[in-house]
Amino acid sequence: MSNVIKPVGYKALLDMRQTEMGIKLIKEFFQANLSTELRLRRVTAPLFVLKGLGINDDLNGVERPVTFPIKDLGDAKAEVVHSLAKWKRLTLAEYKIEPGYGVYTDMNAIRADEELDNLHSLYVDQWDWEAVIEKKDRNLAFLEGVVRRIYAAIRRTEYLTCEHYPQLKPFLPEQIHFVHAQDLLDMYPDKTPKEREDAICKKYGAVFVEGIGGKLSDGKKHDGRAPDYDDWSTIAENGKMGLNGDILIWYPVLERSFELSSMGIRVDKESLLRQLKLEGKKDREKLYFHQQLLNDKLPLSIGGGIGQSRLCMVLLHKAHIGEIQASIWPDEMRKECEENGMNLI
């Protein structure tokens, strides 16, 4: 059964040639903006990592990575990355990056268990970034400051795109609104987490939802997070739990909330041990990445991922991510999309 949203009367505002040129424009301009805004150096990223080192991103903990044996390593298993959340932190240490500086990558990943729809594809491309911070920076005020700078880079890119293609009109608000996942639950107790995001994004246009990963007052999580990169359990200065979150916008083309980025201040030793215990994953303490962190071999950091195809989709006013990137889609979805003005690559 296709999960595709079919906007009534949708017609792409750019043809395929303009779309390809627009993708290039957005990717080059935003990447340069992100790099200068956060003082990030580009580094080359892996497509796969060895299994069993604890380096791959476990996402919500249930998605299966694509694996394959390596003949020259005695059929040792490699995993195609889900993201580079933990790999980047190892890279900060390897490159001896100073506080206030960081790295970014062009990350390509395969998520074979993704539920395919307008926003979700088997193929994931994002700017994965990570920056070194000091202990004094592990607070909500610092996190929100970084979010504002990323959002400013997104809005500058929107302005440039609309200047190049006057048929596209800017819609992102000037400011991004901050709200904790617990406050969302209190505001909309009868709604699901996704419905809460829709409601708050429709109200403010752009929102950073904080504290994703820990249990809320109803005993449920707003959404899942792996226990070993984002710090979702430390009590922040507002008295609430979590130093992480998602950048969401209201996307008028699909009339729904739309996640552009997941990011956060990363775990220190204390929060790593606490979160592994909370999630029943204490056995991970012996893995390579976790040992490096527990033995003070890794710097404190903040980081996240920003969807490349998603950002292009939004700024080019497309209704399906398949209008931006080449991937595999069910025949039924391709047919539905074609009938409703969405020409999938």
For each feature predicted by the language model, list its residue ranges.
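A translation/RNA-centric and nucleic-acid-associated enzymatic feature enriched
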Residues: 110, 181-345
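A generic secondary-structure signal for well-formed alpha-helical elements
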Residues: 34-41, 150-161, 319
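Class II aminoacyl-tRNA synthetase-like tRNA-binding/catalytic domains
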Residues: 2-120, 128-132
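Generic structural hydrophobic/aromatic packing signal, biased to beta-strands
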Residues: 24-26, 30-34, 68, 78-80, ...
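Extended, charged alpha-beta segments that form solvent-exposed binding/catalytic grooves
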Residues: 105-199
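Generic recognition of stable, solvent-exposed alpha-helical segments in well-folded globular domains
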Residues: 21-25, 29, 138-145, 288, ...
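A glycine-rich phosphate-binding loop feature that marks nucleotide/adenosyl-phosphate handling sites
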Residues: 47-51, 166-172, 212, 332-334
